[in-house]
Amino acid sequence: MTDLDHRYPGEETEPYGPPSGSLADLLERVLDKGIVIAGDIKIDLLDIELLTIRLRLFIASVDTAKKAGIDWWETDPALSSRAARDALAEENARLRERLDALEGAAGETTGAVR
């Protein structure tokens, strides 16, 4: 018996979609372009809203997120050592200003006593 090929000339082996790439190619494409997944969960009981959860998920590379204007990880002290340093530097500057003001006030009172 002979096996016959019943496909039309030029027909690909996967007619219902593009040829599948590797998982790495798919991940690279998603991180390069970014993907947004949005959803809402709402729980009502007798027309009384008990719970509403709004989910927004943005999956992208750091560069793509920065292009989209998202950079919260740079300012969150729990995630960025630079943010923690910035917070400490601001606190240090405030404390120095307070110390200078207190020393100035103490100098004025000791000068008035003399």
From Swiss-Prot:
Induction text: Constitutively transcribed at low levels, repressed by argR.
Subcellular locations according to the entry: Gas vesicle
Region (Disordered): 1-21
Keywords, in A-Z order: Gas vesicle
Pfam families: Gas_vesicle
TM regions (residue ranges): none
Principal place of residence: other
Statement: the UniProt record of this protein carries the keyword Hydrolase: no
Basic and acidic residues compositional bias, start-end: 1-10
A single GO cellular-component term on record: vesicle membrane
GO molecular function: structural molecule activity
Keyword Transmembrane helix: no
InterPro entries: Gas-vesicle_GvpA-like (IPR000638), GvpA (IPR050530), GvpA-like_CS (IPR018493)
Function as written in the Swiss-Prot or TrEMBL entry: A minor component of the gas vesicle, might be involved in nucleating gas vesicle formation. Gas vesicles (GV) are hollow, gas filled proteinaceous nanostructures. It is not clear what function GVs perform in soil bacteria.
Family: Belongs to the gas vesicle GvpA family.
Name the record gives this protein: Probable gas vesicle protein J2
Source organism per UniProt: Streptomyces coelicolor (strain ATCC BAA-471 / A3(2) / M145)
Gene that encodes the chain: gvpJ2
